[in-house]
Amino acid sequence: MKGLRSKFVKALSLKDEQGSHKNGHSKSHYISKNGSYVETDDVKHTDTHHSSKHELKKLKSHFLKDTLKHKRNHHANSNNEKHENSDKKIHTTVLASGHEDSDYSTFLPVIETSKVKDANHFPPNYPEPKNDSVSSNIDEFPNDSISSASFLSVPQSTPPYLVSQPTPLNKFLAGAENVDIPHSLRPVPRREHSSQFQVSEKRTLVRLPSFDDVHTSEREELFIKKLEQCNIIFDFNDPSSDLASKEIKREALLQMIDYVSENRGISSASLFPYVVNTFSLNVFRPISPALNDYSSDMFALDDEPFLEPAWPHLEEVYLLFIKFLESPDFRASKAKSLVDRRFFNRLLALFDTEDPRERELLKTTLHRIYGKFLNLRSYIRKSMNNVFLQFIYEREKFHGIAELLEILGSIINGFAVPLKEEHKIFLSKVLIPLHQTKSVFLYHPQLTYCIVQFIDKDPSLTKAVLTGILKYWPRINSFKELLFLNEIEDIFEVLEPSEFVNIMSPLFQQLARSISSMHFQVAERALCLWSNEYFTSLVSQNVVTLLPIIYPSLYKTANEHWNSTIQAIACNVLQIFVDMDADFFNGLVEDYKQAIIKQEEVMIIRKQQWCQIEALAAENKPTDYLR
């Protein structure tokens, strides 16, 4: 096979060389009948052309025939070759050339093997060609296009040492799946199911009597039987399956919810283990990782959240558990062994569900557990901190951040004053870094509420909070900058005048940049801060310090901004400063005009100096080195 390939390549080289020596005599090449490579002098182009064409056609037939024969016997000998492949190391190297007159042999694979000693011999189990006819076997190539332009193409089932590596052109012409698309432009994969339920094998239920139809002494036993019925898990991915039994389970859940809500004196100590078991079997299940996150793909907001098909049963199970926790007869001291850390960890993992309805009921459930089980409070806060830290620094994929922050806001509201050092560390290490994520818009209202609660509890934290917000202030994300400006206004509602002095200079430097923004909504939101009376009063008390910082941006915006509405608002803010202290304002305007004049003079001098340098450079003759 190697000999036939070398003949075939040499014939191609002969054809190429003959094309490069038209209308002249030169040293020519031909292949004799015995296959030897012969050089002759002064052979005419026409004779050599016909002979090389004939040899090329003949060698093409030999080559294709050999390939077809090997394709037939390749699978039959695959078992024998498996034992040989353990000792054989085959490396294929393809060298490509971009010139038309290059040697075609550079495209051939280089075979390195420890067992094939003579490279001119055929590989083991490779059949030798018997005839030159290949026309009857051309149809055996269903997936390969054979043409005169692709003599070296081989079928997909050829040995690895005969398959050439793809060239850059082949990669370019390949399918779209081989194109290296940026990650931010790739479509976000959607998961089909938010969770996986362990469907019960026996799913046939019998309707039990209602609580009103039995004696009072038998209601507790009936309650337990209904709970056992509700332990059966149905397949809601098939809407047409077990319709009657699904309805029986839903009715049983509704009856138990009404029974717990309307009756007092229920022995919760004996029933609560059964309720926890039913809750665990129905609610706790694996949640798929969040794939449709909003960290990099803003267009993912158009995607509808996945709603749990089993929600008709899930909702009632949640409500039953919540009703039990809210029952006046419930005693948390007797349920500590049931609602423990492991139970809470499984409950916390469910906050990653994509269904907002379930996250809402999870939030209520966690509220009740935090209020009832005092021994778990520290562990609950620590576990929530871990979720936030993982979201910030690792994967930024978790659906329930907003709900957890809402729970945390009510927890912070109940903190005792003065705040513990643990809570201050949580503010600086967790809450403030939550501003840096790309998906902050999903939970920003809840985050702002937590920040405001901390400042309200301890005003001395104002400087640390505002410094952290300025640290993570967005530079190119206008939508995120609007959120930060809204948060600044909310913080001013609880800001102490004594604390404002410590942070006003860096804060107003950032406000000046926002006022100068070409995004009209950002500029408008920054200017509208002066519509807040408390904000304006704090500014008036420190106008001497703040006006020099903010005036250049206000002046440029009022005169140069592309939006006429923004220009009008900027003029109104300037008028507010005039009303605060007209004398200081007029003096500042004069100083600003003088500074502008000096700046223009400096620019004129600089321009003149550059003109002089250009004139001197034009007078100098170019040196030999520059030539």
Curated annotation (Swiss-Prot):
GO terms for cellular component: cell division site; cell tip; cytoplasm; protein phosphatase type 2A complex. Keywords: Cytoplasm. The keyword Cytoplasm applies. It is found in: Cytoplasm; Cell tip. Pfam families: B56 (PF01603). Residues 1-37 are annotated as: Disordered. SUPFAM superfamilies: ARM repeat (SSF48371). GO terms for molecular function: protein phosphatase activator activity. The keyword Cytoplasm applies. GO terms for biological process: deactivation of mitotic spindle assembly checkpoint; meiotic sister chromatid cohesion; negative regulation of septation initiation signaling; signal transduction. The B regulatory subunit might modulate substrate selectivity and catalytic activity, and might also direct the localization of the catalytic enzyme to a particular subcellular compartment. Has a role in cell shape control and septum formation. PP2A consists of a common heterodimeric core enzyme, composed of a 36 kDa catalytic subunit (subunit C) and a 65 kDa constant regulatory subunit (PR65 or subunit A), that associates with a variety of regulatory subunits. Proteins that associate with the core dimer include three families of regulatory subunits B (the R2/B/PR55/B55, R3/B''/PR72/PR130/PR59 and R5/B'/B56 families), the 48 kDa variable regulatory subunit, viral proteins, and cell signaling molecules. Belongs to the phosphatase 2A regulatory subunit B family. This is Serine/threonine-protein phosphatase 2A 56 kDa regulatory subunit delta 2 isoform.
